[in-house]
Amino acid sequence: MKKVMMICLFAVAAMTANAQKFALIDMEYVLKNVPAYERANEQLNQVSKKWQAEVEALNTEAGTMYKNYQNEVVFLSEEQKKKKQEAIMQKEKEASDLKRKYFGPEGELFKKRTALLSPIQDEIYNAVKDISDQRGYSLVVDRSADAGIIYGSPIIEISNELLSKLGYQ
């Protein structure tokens, strides 16, 4: 009885192992060949530079205020010193708040990136899912990610097929 159970378990394990099919995609390659992704990244870079310039302008203004304060400190009364220090701290806080608003974890750049890239990512995901369903893949791995893939056979590489399905080849 034990032998029969062991043989059955071994047979089931062997069938399960044979039933799994894998595929590889190179997302870096795919995204480089999707013009909408390149345009979205260019838009994000432009808006990021604009917002960074705004933050830097406030930081520069705060720095200038501090230098002026340093030059005038000997001539100021305690009340004037306190007023100038508060103005400098307010300007630094304003710069910090603006930086957080634009570049923070839930900032404008994050929202804009999500709005621009989510439709592209969804389209790619749906195409990968369609290919996987058609070919019976259990798992699709991104070879460009740090997944520790040392070798992947070109036979299971579907990046070009994915680009064709998306209409870019």
Could you describe each region identified by the protein language model?
Residues 20-135, 139-147, 169:
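Amphipathic alpha-helical segments
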Residues 150-151:
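Short, exposed beta-strand-loop hairpins at the edges of beta-sheets
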